[in-house]
Structure formats: structure tokens, C-alpha cells
Swiss-Prot record:
<comment type="function">
    <text>Has a stimulatory effect on the ATPase activity of HSP70 in a dose-dependent and time-dependent manner and hence acts as a co-chaperone of HSP70. Plays an indispensable role in the organization of KRT8/KRT18 filaments. Acts as an endogenous molecular chaperone for neuronal proteins including huntingtin. Suppresses aggregation and toxicity of polyglutamine-containing, aggregation-prone proteins. Also reduces cellular toxicity and caspase-3 activity.</text>
</comment>
<feature type="modified residue" description="Omega-N-methylarginine">
    <location>
        <position position="135"/>
    </location>
</feature>
<dbReference type="GO" id="GO:0048471">
    <property type="term" value="C:perinuclear region of cytoplasm"/>
</dbReference>
<dbReference type="InterPro" id="IPR001623">
    <property type="entry name" value="DnaJ_domain"/>
</dbReference>
<feature type="region of interest" description="Disordered">
    <location>
        <begin position="249"/>
        <end position="326"/>
    </location>
</feature>
<keyword id="KW-0963">Cytoplasm</keyword>
<dbReference type="InterPro" id="IPR043183">
    <property type="entry name" value="DNJB2/6-like"/>
</dbReference>
<feature type="domain" description="J">
    <location>
        <begin position="2"/>
        <end position="69"/>
    </location>
</feature>
<dbReference type="GO" id="GO:0005634">
    <property type="term" value="C:nucleus"/>
</dbReference>
<keyword id="KW-0488">Methylation</keyword>
<feature type="modified residue" description="Phosphoserine">
    <location>
        <position position="277"/>
    </location>
</feature>
<dbReference type="GO" id="GO:0051082">
    <property type="term" value="F:unfolded protein binding"/>
</dbReference>
<feature type="region of interest" description="Interaction with HSP70">
    <location>
        <begin position="2"/>
        <end position="146"/>
    </location>
</feature>
<comment type="subunit">
    <text>Homooligomer. Interacts with BAG3, HSPB8 and STUB1. Interacts with ALKBH1. Interacts with HSP70, KRT18 and PTTG.</text>
</comment>
<dbReference type="InterPro" id="IPR018253">
    <property type="entry name" value="DnaJ_domain_CS"/>
</dbReference>
<keyword id="KW-0539">Nucleus</keyword>
<dbReference type="GO" id="GO:0030544">
    <property type="term" value="F:Hsp70 protein binding"/>
</dbReference>
Amino acid sequence: MVDYYEVLGVQRHASPEDIKKAYRKLALKWHPDKNPENKEEAERKFKQVAEAYEVLSDAKKRDIYDKYGKEGLNGGGGGGSHFDSPFEFGFTFRNPDDVFREFFGGRDPFSFDFFEDPFEDFFGNRRGPRGSRSRGTGSFFSAFSGFPSFGSGFSSFDTGFTSFGSLGHGGLTSFSSTSFGGSGMGNFKSISTSTKMVNGRKITTKRIVENGQERVEVGEDGQLKSLTINGVADDDALAEERMRRGQNALPAQPAGLRPPKPPRPASLLRHAPHCLSEEEGEQDRPRAPGPWDPLASAAGLKEGGKRKKQKQREESKKKKSTKGNH
């Protein structure tokens, strides 16, 4: 017999908030789209977690479960005894996907981490000592508890919202999220973008989750600064993305926009009539030796050798003619 308290990993006296936290953690962990390599077990665990949450999050269902177990929910508890149960004709569990979507208010839970910056200020979370976090009085879950659940036919949704510093501490400037696909379809993909001003600089974080792989791009004032895949920095992917965006080199300045050279002062021309024009100066100015070229040097040595041999032959002829005259 499955124990719903054990499924969620909570005590029998757990508070409703503890049950919500446990469901959130396990539902994200065992969602089939996050476990493509172990989908059968993930679907089974995902269904159990949804059933446990559906029972323990409802006060009446939880009370009957505590007294009579799962049989009480099916209308059979008490060995034929007469007890007042609203589920005497049997309780039917909902589709786990519907429970999941209703819990998260129709928003994409994979687009960002509810406990990570830059969203913790927006949701009222505060960072505690040693990096731990405690939730504020305004729970994220209660904020979206009034949203209706999506029908089972809906497998994709996209949503976004924008704030202008009026919520939290004013650090979050904008956020948008889009999702494609859904459970049972595979090819799940979500894209979220957040923008936050930090010390006068615009920090943009783009998070892409597709079939269990998370890619995070962080830019500063329009320049891509870092790229991680599943939490690990990828320099090759960063260089490729920067090249694709044309961020490797500074834009060249068009020739037509270069400032013209300032004309020479007239007074300087009057007192220095002997000054040469720039063209004349270039012609008369001695040329600085250029960089050494091995091919040119070899050609020069060869030519020099020819001249030396020719000079030696001419001197030899002169000596012979001189001896003949004597």
C-alpha cells in the first residue's frame, strides 16, 4: 500500500506549506519532460506525487485518508461500516498534468528558478545566512492559486509580465517567458528572458530549456559575457555565439566619416616659403628600410655575385692586354 506521506517525504503532521514545498520539489524532479532517458519511471513517480498532493493538500480528503487510508477515498473504508464520506461513490484522481499546471498557475516552472536571482526580490524571498533562503509571507503559490487549470488538451502556453520597479526592491525591470510543447509530446522547449539594472548596467539573462538541457546566456549592455550549458561554462559555445552576433571585433569606421586633415596655417606658409608640399616631402624624404624579405635578400646576393664576377673578368682582360703591349 502506497503511503502518501512517504511519497512526498513529509511527516504526518506536516503543514499545508510543507506539503506544497514537497510537491513542488518532487514534481519538478520527476516531470517526464525532464527525464527523457528514464521516462517510464518518471511518469510513475510523477503520477504518485500528484495523487499524494491532491489528497494531502485538501483538508477533507486528508482527514478521510488519515482515518481510513486510500480505501476511504474509494468509498470502501471501515469494512462496511457506515461513515460519513463525501466520496462514498469513489474518488477519481485527476490527470497529473492538470495538477501540475494548476499548481504553477499555468506558468512555465522550467523557465526560471523561483529561488534564484533576479526574481527572488519580486516574489518576496530573502537570502538567509550561508546562502539559505526563507520565503516571505506572500507565498508564490498562493499568489497564483486563483488561476484556473488548463484543460488536458492544452499542451503549450506562453506568458509574460513586466514590472517597472514598483514591486520587490525595484531591481527587476522586466521578464518574459514562452513555452512550446508539453508533457506527452516531447520536444519541450521554454525560453525566458529577464532584465535587471545593476550599478547602472543592464544585465540580461536568457534561459533556454529544451528536452532536459538548460542553456543560460548572460549579457551586459548588449554584449554577451557568459554562456553555460547545464550549469557548466562553455567557452566554445560562447565564442561561437559571440561570432554569430558579430561581437568579436569593433565595427570599422567608414572612410567617408573620417575627419579631414586640418590645413596648414597661412602664417606658417608665409614665414617658411621653402616648405615642401606633402607630396614633395614624401619624394625627397629618405625611405626607411622595410622588414627583411628572405626572397629579396637572396635575389640581391645573386645579383651582387654576378656583378663581382663580371668585374673580375674585366680586370683579368686588362692585365692580359697590358702584358701583350709590353
